[in-house]
């Protein structure tokens, strides 16, 4: 039975979509790994090899959908969709929760199973490209560099400019208080 690897990118971001990818490889591809362990250049090279040598699907959940449904429900919907699209495959999701879908899970699967590593790369590269496009619309937020994650620069931009249309309004930023200047 073929393995269908599943992973997501953007889950913990403060802005932008979450991308969830599923991938069945037609042939082995050398160098697959957890996307976070690869350079951006290598991820892009592998992205093109993966898209040419696999059957894959990438699902995006907007910041509005994440705010309305929650991350768990978004992931549950993606996993159920992948069960239909990749019927007959053994589905393996990187993590420790299957969100009630019956999909198999494995912690650090993106570094252990090449199909999950491929899904990790598909999700990360596709989401990063979207965030670079948003950077052109909101250059003051620096999305090109931090991709919407809660870096110091991103938190400072939120303090200075407020949230924008791709901000996740439901995310509470712990230990973040805009500084107040006393006169």
From Swiss-Prot:
Kindly indicate where the leader peptide sits in this chain. Answer: none
Keyword Acyltransferase assigned to the entry: answer is: no
Keyword match Hydrolase = yes
Enzyme Commission code(s) on record: 3.1.26.4
Compartments where located: Cytoplasm
Q: Where is the RNase H type-2 domain?
A: 1-182
Q: Which Pfam families match?
A: RNase_HII (PF01351)
Task: Give the UniProt keywords, A-Z.
Answer: Cytoplasm, Endonuclease, Hydrolase, Manganese, Metal-binding, Nuclease
Q: Which InterPro entries match?
A: RNase_HII, RNase_HII/HIII, RNase_HII/HIII_dom, RNaseH-like_sf, RNaseH_sf
Q: Which cofactor does it need?
A: Mn(2+); Mg(2+)
Q: Provide the top EC class.
A: hydrolase
Catalytic activity line of the entry: Endonucleolytic cleavage to 5'-phosphomonoester
* Bound cofactor: record note: Manganese or magnesium. Binds 1 divalent metal ion per monomer in the absence of substrate. May bind a second metal ion after substrate binding.
- Primary location recorded for the protein, binned into one broad class: cytoplasm
State the CDD domains in the record: RNase_HII_bacteria_HII_like (cd07182)
Q: Which PROSITE patterns match?
A: RNASE_H_2
- List GO BP terms, alphabetically: DNA replication, removal of RNA primer; mismatch repair
Q: Which residues bind a divalent metal cation?
A: 7-8, 94
One GO cellular component assignment for this chain's record is: ribonuclease H2 complex
GO terms of molecular function: manganese ion binding; RNA binding; RNA-DNA hybrid ribonuclease activity
Described by its record, this protein's role is as follows: Endonuclease that specifically degrades the RNA of RNA-DNA hybrids.
HAMAP family, alphabetized: RNase_HII_B
**What protein family does this chain belong to?**
Belongs to the RNase HII family.
- Specify the protein name: Ribonuclease HII
Q: Which source organism?
A: Campylobacter curvus (strain 525.92)
Q: Which gene encodes it?
A: rnhB
